[in-house]
């Protein structure tokens, strides 16, 4: 029965990690927001690893938090373990990772959504969009309800025509046997979207009571209290460990013998899987001479005995999975609770999006998360918050917000997607960021709080605290630039103990700090400040002074990037009317439709000569424009 | 991206004119020039008024040695050709010194201008009339394609193979560092320690240095085309030498490391730097073969890039002439049949046979006839007959050297980072830069390949 269900500013389809951030951002900005999900009990569900963060991804969580998003706060309330990774390396690559209590994570997120002003939660299945003259005006659900909105965000994850595969069994399903979304996928095709088929997988889960942990190595969390959110003040100290074990030659033998039963090799799976999370059968085939592979046993929560067997992602038949478990030390008697599986799903080719995540094909329609060809909760959430912000801004008639590659990992992620596309599920890696020294875990607030505040996602109170921190950093840096440390016996002693060579003369505190063996703590001892220096201020001062040379180099590169970003290309440029462009470049430019020269130069197949030609036309203002018919 | 950096190039035609100008344009033009310029009065270019010219020297900041005596003009934006800050370094004419100045400029922060790039900038900055737009585009297109052809030609063979191998080594090292960062818990991946990284970086530096010293084109640019004049007594070797030297202001040098009795002179023939070997012997009308013996001269000839074989038009070919042809079989030879002012007694058909397709030039050095043809033959040989002097062969060579030098500098930065205890992931920034610079030489800087390498080299996954 068709009926009018209501009118909103923004409708978000899906309430996974992208959907939650999109809905919250939109509602908090002040847009009247409706979020529709297939199953209200599955809000913020983690179908794969029970963990959040890690290299690059952990920094994304901090960025989301600095922009006023929820993921960081939610995991801080619900983790069972947290660790800082890469502590032995430079500041640019440090990252937090937490093991989540999966159920608690969902419950907390649901509570947050339920209590959010301007936000309506609804269980339902969206089957069509209301599109008039290329403009999205709302959605239609399976039950016939028409909901109208000024902007719509699709965050359907792996549900679009999802199919689960275990051995030779294949059935239509979303992740974890949820109902899939088939009609919406067909509808997107009808609208003219180009879809690709991607694949991902998940390992089996076993019962903790049946694991012999004595045969594994313990992996505890950090003792030091840590949190993702800059606003978190309460830390969870009671942490649960993870455990490490390995596959054996016997495991590999079984895989070898049963490879023909794997849908990956039988040709049953056609979707492109990610190289960074291959199945165990992939690993054994590709790295055949490796005698063993690591297996991490990760508890899925405090109130459950279910344990995630990380490293054993597989789509081999269930009975083979059981055999595999028997060969792994500690898991010989482990009870299988859920079998691992592969899932195939539709994603849209992300070069069909503007950097705001609005689709080029349908105005006021945005997509975020796994539907855009990414993988990972953090990647999804990062896109979600940006799509939510832009959808709300569209609805309220405000500016578009685009993060640059030098602003945030989120900027790198979205730019890569919309500029280069992806031919496998995309995962963020630190090596994808050319300015990773600037995009640190520790300075996400310095990079993005200002923007979060301007948009209206950061509270006045938090903003004032942020400004105070910023001032304290500058004050202390300035002090260290001026204070001279003299070679007194006490000073020499401290330096000697740190393993450095003694001073010959007085030296500026900042210069002494630049010595590799010196830390801010040493400097504080030698030249104490008059005020109390908070640890997060000390951290910034130390990093900014110690690595100044490298930071400066990166900043210079960013300067150059900014100049190119400021050379804007009109949206309605007609590339066919520009003579001299190479054929491949012309095709790519027409497809991607970059907004700036900087973006254009990152498209593969567009070479420097094409960029020069483009510049010539732009400078001349003689751009032929495609008429907007 | 390269649209907004400081560019430099030799902006006068090569080998012609009494002065040669190295021009810089861009934000850092004055700053870069200041790093190299020493004025006798100690003034700095950043302090001088716009549109003024200054006397001084170009000094290599690394060695502190004077490279060239110069006049430097400083012209600040916007009243310049490109509407950017422009510095012009006026050098003495001659290939070697101006090229060294250019190399220094490039090593100190400028990028070698692409063909037509000064014009392009002038255009982009609104200096040039609208009607010239299409012409500029044609220029960009044509010159780029051509530069690419030249680059590709040069890239065939050993140099490109070496660079690709070197890049692969760096890439594997980078992937190794990256995998430690992105997958810190994979304990079966060996940790890339500073010591290990240093080993790799030193290896790469060594290879780059080797490349810099062995890349033939690079050697020619720095040292000139090793040229030997041979011929029987009294065929006119000495006159040929004088003609080349006279026309082109030879610089006499005593090169350390070569045999003491072999003296070299530099001449610049239509932009081709020739290093004439054993000029002393020739001036004493002795042939190199007579002087240092057959075996040694054979060695000498083998090392030569170019051999000028002189014959006497007035006399029949002798056994000795035939022997010289035999000694130079398969080498780059220009046959000069001299003394055409006298009646012909030589068997030209036989000469053509012996020359086997290599160029033959008829001259009368006494009457100063045929010298132009000879110079053209030399230039044709060097530029492969495709490019006129001052064009791209020289440019791309210079470009490769500049890129190699920059890559070397990046590696050195990486090494000094390791020495002062910087974390591996910061040191890696410089290593990666070296990889990108080497990639520019072979025309390959695809970012994605690092990620491909990561997954090919290591076994990762959930």
Curated annotation (Swiss-Prot), chain A:
It is found in: Cytoplasm. GO terms for cellular component: cytosol. It comes from Geobacillus thermodenitrificans (strain NG80-2). GO terms for molecular function: flavin adenine dinucleotide binding. One of its GO terms (biological process) is tRNA methylation. NCBIfam families: mnmG_gidA. This is tRNA uridine 5-carboxymethylaminomethyl modification enzyme MnmG. Belongs to the MnmG family. Its cofactor is FAD. PANTHER family: GLUCOSE INHIBITED DIVISION PROTEIN A, PROTEIN MTO1 HOMOLOG, MITOCHONDRIAL. Homodimer. Heterotetramer of two MnmE and two MnmG subunits. Pfam families: GIDA, GIDA_C_1st, SAM_GIDA_C. NAD(+) binds at residues 273-287. Keywords: Cytoplasm, FAD, Flavoprotein, NAD, tRNA processing. FAD binds at residues 14-19, 126, 181, 370. InterPro entries: FAD/NAD-bd_sf (IPR036188), GIDA_C_N (IPR049312), MnmG (IPR004416), MnmG-rel (IPR002218), MnmG-rel_CS (IPR020595), MnmG_C (IPR026904), MnmG_C_subdom (IPR047001), MnmG_C_subdom_sf (IPR044920). Gene3D superfamilies: FAD/NAD(P)-binding domain (3.50.50.60), GidA associated domain, C-terminal subdomain (1.10.150.570), tRNA uridine 5-carboxymethylaminomethyl modification enzyme MnmG/GidA (1.10.10.1800). NAD-binding protein involved in the addition of a carboxymethylaminomethyl (cmnm) group at the wobble position (U34) of certain tRNAs, forming tRNA-cmnm(5)s(2)U34. It comes from the Bacteria.
From Swiss-Prot, chain B:
Mg(2+) binds at residues 238, 259. GO terms for biological process: tRNA methylation; tRNA wobble uridine modification. K(+) binds at residues 234, 253, 255, 258. One of its GO terms (molecular function) is GTP binding. Its EC number is 3.6.-.-. Homodimer. Heterotetramer of two MnmE and two MnmG subunits. Binds 1 potassium ion per subunit. SUPFAM superfamilies: P-loop containing nucleoside triphosphate hydrolases, TrmE connector domain. CDD domains: trmE, TrmE_N. GO terms for cellular component: cytosol. Belongs to the TRAFAC class TrmE-Era-EngA-EngB-Septin-like GTPase superfamily. TrmE GTPase family. GTP binds at residues 234-239, 253-259, 278-281. (6S)-5-formyl-5,6,7,8-tetrahydrofolate binds at residues 23, 88, 127, 462. Exhibits a very high intrinsic GTPase hydrolysis rate. Involved in the addition of a carboxymethylaminomethyl (cmnm) group at the wobble position (U34) of certain tRNAs, forming tRNA-cmnm(5)s(2)U34. It comes from the Bacteria. Keywords: Cytoplasm, GTP-binding, Hydrolase, Magnesium, Metal-binding, Nucleotide-binding, Potassium, tRNA processing. PANTHER family: TRNA MODIFICATION GTPASE GTPBP3, TRNA MODIFICATION GTPASE GTPBP3, MITOCHONDRIAL. This is tRNA modification GTPase MnmE. Its cofactor is K(+). Residues 224-383 form the TrmE-type G domain. It is found in: Cytoplasm. It is an enzyme of class 3 (hydrolase). It holds the Pfam family TrmE_N.
